[in-house]
Amino acid sequence: MANTEHDELASLLRETNEAEQSLTDQEAITETVEENTTIASSFGDGTFLWDEDPLSGYTPSCEDTRIMEDKISRIEKQLQYLLSKADEFQTQLVWSRNCVQDYGFGNIIPMFLETCQPFFSLLESTARNSNPFCPPQSSNIRMQLLQFSQQLCSRLEQLVLLFASFSFCSLEESDPLSVSHFSIGQCQIDNMKVSIFRYCCPTPFLASSLTGLYKRMRWNVEREIEGEGDGKTYDSAEFYFLCCEDVIEAADDQNEDRSSEGESTETDSESKVSRIWSIGRWVQTYPDPNTEDIIDWVLCSLPCGQYKQLLCLGNEEPSSCTATDCLLGALLSQETHGTFSIIK
């Protein structure tokens, strides 16, 4: 009896210590992120930014360079801290898999992803935010910050997939508790607020049916409405996706191409499957988003929509930062020149 009580007390103390340690770790991460948010705010004030165009005739002073390098260094230290925490969680999982229930691993991933969100937003907003009253960020600084974002994104994706392989989290989008995707930052470009999300693995574009289309990223784009009071007011969000689709190239088509090039076609009997990457927009078809009939909305359990391709990116999967660059470039082109249209 005494041994049973002792074991229960030891278990309770262990769980309490682990909970306190997790809370301490989260507070430490949060404090460091808040500190670096203050640092990052000075990137956009124009104080230590310079035009890298050699024709400008401006060369940054040694003091300017030193201050900028110090700011980058402090943000990089925060990145290394988050990466080390990811390594620590992975080590705990691998070495403790025989007694995993004692470590509360099911809560680690959601908590850690949420903790990393402010740091992602710090990187994305500092690198991409546009302000008409401040000079643009130097390309070198922008590249470093986006590399930090890409590095952390890739590491978190690996960590989520590892925990999912041990059944500590679900990647099924239909599961309310799943971690099929996570936030990798937010930025403000002109009148657009862009929230960026990364799917941990190719996920069916429609959860209700298989279309052969799989999503890898999502962007929620909200446009600011002018003349709506003192505070900023945004229109309803538009949803854009980075998707892939396996396209079968018929053997006859391949043979024709090769025949025209003078190549032999005797062994070309199998079809080739090519994975094509594209960026497109979710367009709702039912209920009609422009209808004022509320009955359609009340009776509809799940809105219907389709994927409208905007950009074709080819066979190679782009990084999350490159894909975001492509989308923002297209959206800004549409805003400026009105030349951007949906590919039918």
UniProtKB/Swiss-Prot annotation:
Name used for this protein in its record: UPF0575 protein C19orf67 homolog
Top-level taxon of the source organism: Eukaryota
Pfam families cross-referenced by the UniProt entry: DUF3314
Species assigned in the record: Danio rerio
InterPro entries: DUF3314 (IPR021748)
Family: Belongs to the UPF0575 family.
